[in-house]
Every structure is written in structure tokens, then in C-alpha cells.
């Protein structure tokens, strides 16, 4: 990799912050870092359009919350975006990354496993909207850095346990 490759990689990368979502077309790369949060990547193979959201919590406590940190709100807005752009949900694919159990507690603890809850609600909402989940790297006890390549819809995942995978 030479200097031009590195500069192109940086100029084509869009960072998605916690509680946010971004979308773009190929050749962009969308990037985020998750622990118990979940990165939701939705992709159209037709034209390289992709959307990445970084959710923190499963559901907004009140339905007045306009915040991408909640899976229910973020997924509904992502679907709305794809519909406005004319996409059929059945032609889209999704990939999920994250949902780790970062905060360890005793077995009797009343602290919920928020990572697992995040993964479950994302799966449920995507399936209810006829979006096929093509791949996942979820749960476990480690965070992950996600690079969503809009050229081909692949996710390069660098796990904090030292492993790397491509979804």
C-alpha cells in the first residue's frame, strides 16, 4: 500500500458516531466502533448504496424520541430512506456487528445484557421488514471496529480479541 492508497482510503472513509447513521454510494467506506452497541449495515447490490447505523439501545422509552441511538428509531428511519429512494426491501441485505457483553456482573444481577437485547431487536425489526440478514459477528465479550465497503457490501471487522473477519 503506497501513500496514494492510504490517502484515498482516508478520503473515502466516513465515520459513523455512536447514536448516528450515515449513507452513501460506492466507493465510500463507512466506519464505526462498537462494543455492546450494534452496527447495522444495509446494502443494495444493485447500485452500491449503503447505510450504516450505530445503535446503543433497543427501544426508545417514549416514541417521541428522534434519536438514532435507539434500534427501533434508527431502523425505521433507514427503511424510510431506502423506500424514498425507490428500493424494495426484499432486494436489500443486512449485516449486524456488535452486541458484546462488555459489562460483567454476577449471575444474580438485575443488569440486563444490553448487547444481546440490541442484537435481538435488530434481527426482529429487519425480519419484520423483509430485509434478509446476510451475515453477523455478534455477542461475545469484545468490541469490534467495522469497515463497510460500499464497492461490494463487504464488512471488514477487526475484533478487539485480535481476530479479523470479512462478512
Predicted segments with their positions:
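Phosphate-centric recognition/catalysis
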Residues: 1-32
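Glycine-rich anion-binding loops of enzyme active sites
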Residues: 17-22, 101-106, 141, 145-155
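N-terminal intrinsically disordered, cationic/polar leader segments
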Residues: 20-31, 36, 44, 116-117, ...
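Short acidic-glycine loop/turn motifs at beta-strand connectors
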Residues: 25, 44-48, 149-152
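Conserved mixed alpha/beta catalytic, RNA-binding, or beta-rich assembly cores of soluble enzyme
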Residues: 30-85
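Glycine-rich beta-strand-to-loop/alpha-helix junction loops that act as flexible
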Residues: 95-100
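Divalent-metal-activated hydrolytic enzyme cores
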Residues: 115-167
Amino acid at each position: 500500500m503506497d501513500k496514494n492508497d492510504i490517502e484515498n482510503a482516508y478520503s473515502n472513509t466516513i465515520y459513523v458516531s455512536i447514536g448516528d447513521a450515515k449513507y452513501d454510494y460506492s466507493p465510500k467506506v463507512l466506519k464505526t466502533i462498537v462494543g455492546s452497541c450494534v452496527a447495522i449495515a444495509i446494502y443494495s447490490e444493485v447500485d452500491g448504496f449503503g447505510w450504516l447505523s450505530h445503535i446503543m439501545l433497543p427501544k426508545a422509552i417514549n416514541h417521541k424520541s428522534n434519536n438514532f441511538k435507539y434500534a427501533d428509531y434508527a431502523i425505521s428511519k433507514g427503511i424510510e430512506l431506502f423506500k424514498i429512494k425507490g428500493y424494495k426491501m426484499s432486494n436489500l441485505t443486512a449485516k449486524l456487528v456488535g452486541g458484546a457483553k462488555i459489562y460483567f456482573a454476577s449471575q444474580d444481577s438485575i443488569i440486563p445484557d444490553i448487547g444481546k437485547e440490541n442484537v435481538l431487536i435488530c434481527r426482529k425489526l429487519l425480519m419484520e421488514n423483509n430485509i434478509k440478514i446476510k451475515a453477523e459477528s455478534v455477542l461475545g465479550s469484545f468490541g469490534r471496529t467495522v469497515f463497510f465497503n460500499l464497492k461490494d457490501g463487504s464488512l471488514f471487522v477487526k475484533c478487539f480479541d485480535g481476530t479479523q473477519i470479512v462478512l
